[in-house]
Amino acid sequence: MADESSDAAGEPQPAPAPVRRRSSANYRAYATEPHAKKKSKISASRKLQLKTLMLQIAKQEMEREAEERRGEKGRVLSTRCQPLVLDGLGFEELQDLCRQLHARVDKVDEERYDVEAKVTKNITEIADLTQKIYDLRGKFKRPTLRRVRISADAMMQALLGTRAKESLDLRAHLKQVKKEDIEKENREVGDWRKNIDALSGMEGRKKKFEG
């Protein structure tokens, strides 16, 4: 027994089998082949029941919030607008009460105006900050442009201002040439052979050849 154990210990252990990896084709085939769809743990009827329950809870919450707002509004109105006691009041007392009510209305209007001014200011600041953010990001908001028909003269007038007339008057910058000068140039060009003969001294020889 001891010899067998010693022989087993002396022999080299066999190498483990190499792990076979799937090729790209195998992975592609595995991805494209149909697999059994996993069944959902919740049935369709159970899902419908849960959705209905969630909608009912949301509806109850909205109704509760609306009731709380109505109650809060009633409490505020009861504290600020107390019922008037007009029994046993004389003419002068009624006038004093009307003056007090008018003064309270004026005060409320002033407060409302101040609140509206603050809201308008905040809206303007928010719009300015939003535009600055767009500018920093490089996203410029395009303004709404209207199509306007305009002539070329009006466009040049708008672009150049007082220089529009000067730029449009192109003939003023051209050199004026008289008709007499043009005829003179044509006459000189037409007699170029005579001029060449006179300059070259060939007029006598030409007569000999012609004779």
UniProtKB/Swiss-Prot annotation:
One example of a Gene Ontology biological process annotation: regulation of systemic arterial blood pressure by ischemic conditions
Q: Which Pfam families match?
A: Troponin, Troponin-I_N
Single GO molecular function: calcium-dependent protein binding
On this chain, the residues bearing N-acetylalanine are: A2
Spell out the residue ranges making up region: Involved in binding TNC and actin: 130-151
Q: Which residues carry this modification: Phosphothreonine?
A: T32, T52, T79, T130, T144
Regions crossing the membrane: none
Q: Where is this site: Involved in TNI-TNT interactions?
A: C81, C98
**Keyword terms, alphabetized:** Acetylation, Actin-binding, Muscle protein, Phosphoprotein
Q: Where is this region: Disordered?
A: 1-25
List modified residues, type Phosphoserine.
S5, S6, S23, S24, S43, S45, S78, S151, S167, S200
Which GO CC annotations does the UniProt entry carry? Answer: cardiac myofibril; cardiac Troponin complex; contractile muscle fiber; cytoplasm; myofibril; sarcomere; troponin complex
Q: Which superkingdom, per the lineage?
A: Eukaryota
Modification note: Phosphorylated at Ser-23 and Ser-24 by PRKD1; phosphorylation reduces myofilament calcium sensitivity. Phosphorylated preferentially at Thr-32. Phosphorylation by STK4/MST1 alters its binding affinity to TNNC1 (cardiac Tn-C) and TNNT2 (cardiac Tn-T). Phosphorylated at Ser-43 and Ser-45 by PRKCE; phosphorylation increases myocardium contractile dysfunction.
Q: What Gene3D superfamilies has UniProt attached to this entry?
A: 1.20.5.350, 6.10.250.180
Where does the record place the modification Phosphotyrosine?
Y27
Q: From the UniProt entry, list the residue stretches annotated as the region Involved in binding TNC.
A: 33-80
Function text: Troponin I is the inhibitory subunit of troponin, the thin filament regulatory complex which confers calcium-sensitivity to striated muscle actomyosin ATPase activity.
Per the record, the similarity remark reads: Belongs to the troponin I family.
Give the multimer and partner information: Interacts with TRIM63. Binds to actin and tropomyosin. Interacts with STK4/MST1.
Record protein name field: Troponin I, cardiac muscle
Which species is listed as the source?
A: Rattus norvegicus (Rat)
